[in-house]
Amino acid sequence: MAKVLFVKANNRPADQSATVKLYESFLKTYKETHPEDAVTELNLFDAELPYYDLNMLNGLFKVGKGIEATAEEQKAADLANTYLDQFLGADKVVFAFPLWNFTIPAQLLTYLFYLNQAGKTFKYTEQGPVGLVGDKKIALLQARGGVYSEGPMAALEMSLNYVKNTLAFWGINNPEVVVVEGHNQFPDRAEAIIQDGVKRAADLAAKF
């Protein structure tokens, strides 16, 4: 039995969000084809994660070094480590997130900040940082209304690239990826574009 964590970074309803359609398609098919696995869903908007701030920064440093932290620092560090432990304990993780204003939602950025901890997801060496979770299986589901995979908008794509670069820093270099793009740019083909992505998400889920 595998432990699977589904991380959802979009609070729009499915009828308004291609990203959520991908998420629901993947989740439904995964549960149908892997009934023995333990699935946990984490909705980052429902979680209302506090921003990564001075208390969390100092708290994580002090806790990691065995230094006494203030009550506020300890509380912040414990919160971040709760999410980190959940991530580390999962055999597979599925992220679903949109491209908003060229990047990822603030909720996902905050979550990734929680996970980005030296000694846990990466370590420093004389040769440079080395990822520590390269054996984790990852799927990324994303929808973006314009075309960012090529052409003049490609340089502005700081959403999927950001997440992939963060994962690579942790040693995860080959995540499975399903992207839907162009459904707002080409409204006459929007439904076909989205449904193609929904099918690809389901196909990936069946073999993930």
Sequence positions of predicted segments:
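Short histidine/acidic/glycine/proline-rich micro-motifs that form metal-
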Residues: 11-14, 146-147, 184-185
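Cofactor-binding loop segments of dinucleotide-utilizing enzymes, especially the Rossmann-like FAD-
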Residues: 9, 143, 180
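N-terminal beta1-alpha1-beta2 submodule of the flavodoxin-like/Rossmannoid cofactor-binding fold
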Residues: 1-97, 102-106, 110-113, 117, ...
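Residues at the starts of beta-strands that form the adenosine-phosphate
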Residues: 3, 38, 136-138, 174
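Short, glycine-/small-residue-rich phosphate/pyrophosphate-handling segment
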Residues: 124-169
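Substrate-gripping "pore-loop 1 plus following alpha2 helix"
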Residues: 118-124
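Glycine-rich phosphate/pyrophosphate-binding loop and the adjoining helix
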Residues: 150-208
